[in-house]
Amino acid sequence: MISEKGLCKVLSAAYKGGGYSVIPVQRRVETVARTWRRNEIILNGATWAVRCLTEDLPKEAAVQIVKDVGYMPMEPVSVQKSQPNQTMLEDVADIRESQLEELRDGSSVMVKIPVIFRDRWQLYQTTTGAVYAFDTELLKLIDFKEVSPECRITPHGNMAMFLWEDEMVFLAPGRFSRENEEKILYIAGMDWENQVEADDPVVNLNLFNADQDEPLLTPEE
């Protein structure tokens, strides 16, 4: 599910910006037949995170990490251009890991609405009608041509999860001014199912005042 090209681009932008963290994880797995440990890795930026088996980390992303950090970390570390590497306290790393583990509890399923507005924000909607927008650059972390991941949003709407087998991508949604909330809901209320079947989805729909939207996320590059 994780796009090699997309992840490398996001890592590069994060490294030049606010930095990112690399958190190796050893998880104990127990079954009736046997018990073993499996190695996972978490990559965590300001508004995104990726989690997968270490062996499934895209090769070029591993190369990018080695280039940025200077080596492949075996312990949690944060890295940023022109700054010394910061070793992460074990307690802090454990908290971040557990927070990601708990996000799925009480989460709701989302479906994509085929609208990209202002050339940047992809809309998703839950079964209860709540609508969220995600930066299309961060969505490039996911190879949607290869898989159709399960999409979920936390109960408070502060983090989305895209899940496929042992791979996970976490994204913070954007936030917009109250004035535009009704317009977002109007877009979501359109009969998208029939429009898609008729091969007539709306793309780059712009009902927003350029001076009024207030994105929560900052550009990664």
Predicted stretch roles:
Residues 7-11, 62, 184:
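Generic structural signal of hydrophobic/aromatic residues within well-ordered alpha-helices
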Residues 54-55, 135:
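Generic structural signal for alpha-helix starts
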